[in-house]
């Protein structure tokens, strides 16, 4: 998903969120691919991607299989995409709030400034984008299906006519 929120300064706030609609329980390697494709898509929409592999843990503050999956995926992604700013595993507050980032991961170039979010599974991703859309006043465009031979996109059953029109424009632009 690409999410856009107009700001008072006239510059839109633009975010990318993946995977919110297709991969139910992506593996570490699938998350690496999702991150790379999401970063490339973000660039198309004017985002200089700063990728956060989201978790309930920041740099080892929590334990468990899900934490390990996101930490390992972030490590593999940094190896595969050495020029892409990547942090993980990281909690959402540390990913977006500079004050929190200074406390939880002060050495990170991404923490506090992330704009491309990789969720651990479809549950978290779908909930996350809908919270941003419904409570954060972001317009959500997607899902934008990546990694295919041709652009193909989907729409939420809750979408409106403007979102249908916007997705048609996005699909044509990706062709």
Predicted regions span which residues?
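Anion-binding alpha/beta catalytic cores of soluble intermediary-metabolism enzymes, centered on
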Residues: 1-175
């Amino acid at each position: 998903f690409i999410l856009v929120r107009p700001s008072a300064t006239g510059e839109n706030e633009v975010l990318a969120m993946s995977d919110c609609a297709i991969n139910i329980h992506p593996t570490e390697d699938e998350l690496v691919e999702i991150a790379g494709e999401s970063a490339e898509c973000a660039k198309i929409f004017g985002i200089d991607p700063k990728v956060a592999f989201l978790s309930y843990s920041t740099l080892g503050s929590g334990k468990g299989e899900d934490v390990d999956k996101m930490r390992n995926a972030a490590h593999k992604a940094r190896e595969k995409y050495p020029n892409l700013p990547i942090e993980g595993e990281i909690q959402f507050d540390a990913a977006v709030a500079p004050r929190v980032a200074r406390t939880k991961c002060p050495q990170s170039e991404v923490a506090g400034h992330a704009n491309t979010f990789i969720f651990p599974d479809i549950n978290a991703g779908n909930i996350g984008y809908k919270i941003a859309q419904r409570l954060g006043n972001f317009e959500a465009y997607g899902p934008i299906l990546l990694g295919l031979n041709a652009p193909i996109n989907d729409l939420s059953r809750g979408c409106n006519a403007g979102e249908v029109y916007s997705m048609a424009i996005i699909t044509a632009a990706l062709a």
